[in-house]
Amino acid sequence: MDHDLEIFPLLSYVLHHSDPASHAPPSLAIQQSLANRYPLLTNPYVISSLIESIPSTITQTLFVFGSLGPRPDPLAVSSARSKIREIKENDSLSPEDAAKEEQVYAAVVSLEEVHEGYEKQLRDLEEEIGRVYASAVESLSGGDEVNEEVLAVIKDAEDGGVVERIDLSDHELKLLPDALGKIVGLVSLNVSRNNLRFLPDTISGLEKLEELDLSSNRLVFLPDSIGLLLNLRILNVTGNKLTLLPESIAQCRSLVELDASFNNLTSLPANFGYGLLNLERLSIQLNKIRFFPNSICEMRSLRYLDAHMNEIHGLPIAIGRLTNLEVMNLSSNFSDLIELPDTISDLANLRELDLSNNQIRVLPDSFFRLEKLEKLNLDQNPLEYPPQEMVNQSAEAVREFMRKRWEEMVEEEQLRSVIEAEKQQGGATGWLSWGSSIVTSLFSGGTHGGAAKKPKNSFLDEQL
């Protein structure tokens, strides 16, 4: 468990539900205690409200708090403070000597004060979560969150009406009723630009749903049941507060477009690419993603990938398998993206590549193999190869420069191989060459040692 979070049970519980991979769950005893004290804690609306109340700086706060080490013993702190007072009251000590003696005791007091400061931050946050819980429960009891238009649509469907498309965008919705999942004939659902914090699990009942627009809401997580939408082709969750996508999303095998941009994602599900084999467009820009899962290389249908403004450290070695990829934007990953794998040159259909605002110094030697590349942006990189004057010309100029560089490297390698082979051959047959030279000298009338020689007979030129 995170450092000392046992004393902040509510915070511990919410952190685990917001990011299970980074935060361990509270002990069973604490979970039972929380269930008794907060009976609606598992309600989707309530837990989403609590997750939303967690500040984005909590990760840094917990990291610093955890790196402080053990808290000083209270008796040691009290003793240190007494010693500091004694030193200050001792007039016989010079200011320099007093400062030296105070230094050891001041370190103990300072560490205690830092602990107190961070613990107060977490305690205040624990209390704030409690207040948010009370407010969320009160909102639930109000019963006025379900829009009348939503209820009318559901009633129409229950009365036998055929409802294929629902557009409830800009309706200030706070929640969707469970009964929405009963509209089995629904093909398109647009609930963008509302105040939704969660989706009901019953959304899995929309078996024919092909388009789902959840953009510009306040969602902090997606239900696992979303993986049961087997006919879903377009999913838009941009502009929410998602910190992760459920593993079950890989089961949406019909998905063609996924827009998860402008969230708080730090990673993608490990199995992401194994299921989404039909995905053509993936937009994950404006997140905090550091690495792509290796499974993304299995998404052979992918044509468009936008991952700009993240914290991408590099691409998987097998990225070259995305042979249908046409557009890739990796710009503005700043100090995190410093190199590209050689396999990027296997992206045979790549037409546009944006690598601006990174820390790339050298392009892969095989970069010239991107024959279809038309647009290349390398602005704001500390490039050494190719030189900036080539970069300023065109993608074709860069490609041609890298081609010539490659040919020169091949020639150098071939020459090196020939020289190495001759060295090895010379070492293995040196005695034979020496013996042959003596025989040649004798037959030609010369002497071994450099005297003038007559023309050699041609048969002596044959390899022994």
Curated annotation (Swiss-Prot):
UniProt repeat feature LRR, residue ranges: 160-183, 184-206, 207-230, 232-252, 254-275, 276-299, 301-322, 323-347, 348-370, 372-393
Bilayer-spanning residue ranges: none
Sequence motif: GVYW, positions: 398-406
Keyword field contains Repeat: yes
Transport is among the record's keywords: no
Parts forming coiled coils: 106-138
SUPFAM superfamilies linked to this entry: L domain-like (SSF52058)
The organism's place on the tree of life at top rank: Eukaryota
Tissues/organs with expression: Widely expressed.
Entry's Gene Ontology molecular function annotations: protein serine/threonine kinase activity
Any single biological process term in GO: microgametogenesis
Keywords, alphabetical: Coiled coil, Leucine-rich repeat, Repeat
Function: Leucine-rich repeat protein that likely mediates protein interactions, possibly in the context of signal transduction.
Family: Belongs to the SHOC2 family.
Protein name: Plant intracellular Ras-group-related LRR protein 3
The organism of origin for this protein: Arabidopsis thaliana
Encoding gene (name): PIRL3
